[in-house]
Regions:
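Macrodomain-like recognition of ADP-ribose-binding/processing modules
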Residues: 1-151
Length: 151
């Protein structure tokens, strides 16, 4: 999918908001190529609708970590949270924003999320992070767990 300039500006949080589709969605899981792959199906009573939030992290691939712009990260994270607040979203599942393929530094990303969530804590009932660690590559899960422990 190629984004228009307006969509790129939106998902980059340039104006303090990001894309939020408030039409409820439900994930549909297809058949696996073979047994033992993927996840089991949820029971019908455990299936829940969700809203889609799109927000683009800075792509640090090939860039020097010295060029990392924490103010830009903070702006984009604040835009995510402010978008949810403006829409009355009180339960949010976020990610290790840009810490995988885009090579953003997970300790800085996690700490920035912690600070920005703390500023807005009265607006959320649940803030969770869905972070998968396959056992190889960066351990973003461990970093986020350590930084958020006791928060």
């Amino acid at each position: 999918m190629e984004y228009s300039d307006a969509m790129h500006r939106l998902v980059s949080g340039q104006d303090g908001r990001v894309y939020l589709d408030t039409s409820p969605r439900v994930c549909i899981k297809g058949a696996e190529e073979r047994d033992g792959l993927g996840y089991g199906l949820l029971a019908d009573e455990d299936v829940f609708p969700f809203f889609e939030l799109r927000s683009a992290a800075v792509d640090m691939r090939g860039a020097s970590q010295k060029s990392y712009d924490n103010a830009e990260l903070r702006k984009r994270i604040a835009a995510q949270l402010d978008t949810c607040m403006a829409a009355g979203v009180r339960h949010v599942v976020l990610s290790a924003f840009g810490c995988g393929a885009f090579q953003n530094p997970s300790p800085i990303v996690a700490e920035t999320y912690k600070q920005e969530v703390r500023k807005r804590k009265e607006h959320f009932d649940v803030v969770a992070f869905a972070i998968f660690h396959a056992g190889y590559g960066p351990d973003n899960f461990g970093v986020f767990r350590e930084i958020f422990e006791g928060a």
